[in-house]
């Protein structure tokens, strides 16, 4: 994963901004750019320092800026609190931006409201889908079941006890897809594997944000014989990863390369089930520039288009057998061409 540029604070604003310029990265558009497109990114309260969704979304914008064929100027505004979301989007609207990218489900309602009020501006939101969005708004979603399936192959093959666990966030579609894929991937690799798993019950402010609960659940699974755990539930899942570190077990991260985003878990992290967020954002920006904006308000990223996968094995690269790496590569190819299914039917 590429490093994220430093952020300069603008004290008079409720947000922080970074400016990037397109057409080969120059500060002025190249002569070949008959039009320059302005793209703004609004983070959730996790900001760019999350090394996760926000940071990866901004990387996708930067990748678009670096592509001289797109002629992009870009700016990011970091939100300090939820009440900033619409205000920050409006800053881009007031400056006549061509496209606004927002990050995550926390911005779902606000993005919809601002998009409806500004039909001539394109909007894309990372990891969120609407049932009937306006034509200028598209959700960027992922086949979590495919990423989970690949991670499950690794977990199944790396387990020495024949038992693996998963600590999940709320039972909502993206999380459910991860679980189904992970468990079925493990069974694809080792038919006799035992899978343990638990969803976090609705917990108000602690939903996806209860590492103590996640740690307790993972510890209980280790007591039942599991020797590797998948933490797929935000900070709740991170608690499961910490339990693995403390119990000297293995773990699998989620969404992004958690070896980079959550260094406390590096000791146990074999890989992460990953959504290629930067790729999805650059794709949406490209669609805006090329006038190939998707109909139906949805862009789906999967194994076929390179939108999901697993992260590098990092410290465990020498411990993952070549045969396992080959199995993962083969499964990825088959998921991409449709000859292998994850078992998710939702």
Predicted regions, residues:
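Bacterial signal peptide processing site
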Residues: 24-26
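Bacterial N-terminal signal peptides that target proteins for export
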Residues: 1-11
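A residue-level marker of the well-folded mature domains of exported/periplasmic proteins
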Residues: 29-346
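C-terminal motif of bacterial Sec signal peptides marking the signal peptidase cleavage site
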Residues: 18-22
């Amino acid at each position: 994963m590429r490093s994220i540029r430093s952020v300069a604070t603008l004290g008079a604003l409720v947000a922080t901004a970074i400016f990037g310029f397109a057409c080969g990265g120059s500060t002025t558009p190249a002569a070949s750019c008959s039009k320059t497109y302005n793209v703004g990114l609004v983070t959730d309260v996790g900001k760019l320092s999350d090394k996760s969704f926000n940071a990866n979304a901004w990387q996708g914008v930067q990748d678009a800026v670096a592509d001289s064929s797109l002629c992009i100027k870009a700016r990011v505004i970091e939100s300090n609190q939820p009440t900033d979301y619409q205000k920050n989007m409006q800053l881009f609207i007031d400056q006549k931006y061509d496209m606004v990218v927002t990050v995550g489900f926390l911005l779902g309602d606000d993005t919809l409201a601002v998009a409806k009020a500004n039909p001539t501006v394109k909007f894309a939101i990372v990891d969120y889908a609407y049932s009937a969005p306006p034509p200028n708004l598209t959700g960027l979603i992922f086949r979590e079941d495919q990423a989970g399936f690949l991670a499950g192959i690794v977990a199944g093959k790396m387990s020495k006890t024949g038992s693996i666990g998963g600590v999940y966030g709320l039972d909502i579609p993206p999380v459910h897809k991860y679980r189904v894929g992970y468990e079925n991937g493990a069974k694809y690799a080792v038919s006799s594997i035992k899978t343990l798993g638990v969803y976090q019950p609705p917990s108000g402010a602690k939903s996806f944000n209860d590492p103590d609960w996640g740690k307790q659940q993972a510890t209980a699974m280790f007591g039942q014989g599991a020797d590797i755990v998948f933490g797929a539930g935000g900070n709740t899942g991170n608690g499961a990863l910490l339990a693995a570190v403390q119990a000297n077990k293995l773990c699998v991260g989620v969404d992004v390369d958690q070896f980079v985003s959550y260094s406390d878990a590096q000791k146990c992290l074999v890989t992460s089930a990953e959504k290629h967020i930067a790729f999805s954002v650059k794709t949406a920006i490209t669609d805006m520039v090329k006038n190939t904006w998707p109909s139906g308000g949805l862009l789906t990223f999967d194994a076929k288009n390179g939108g999901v996968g697993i992260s590098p094995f990092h410290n465990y690269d020498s411990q993952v057998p070549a045969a396992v790496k080959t199995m993962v590569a083969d499964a990825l190819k088959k998921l991409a061409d449709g000859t292998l299914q994850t078992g998710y039917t939702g």
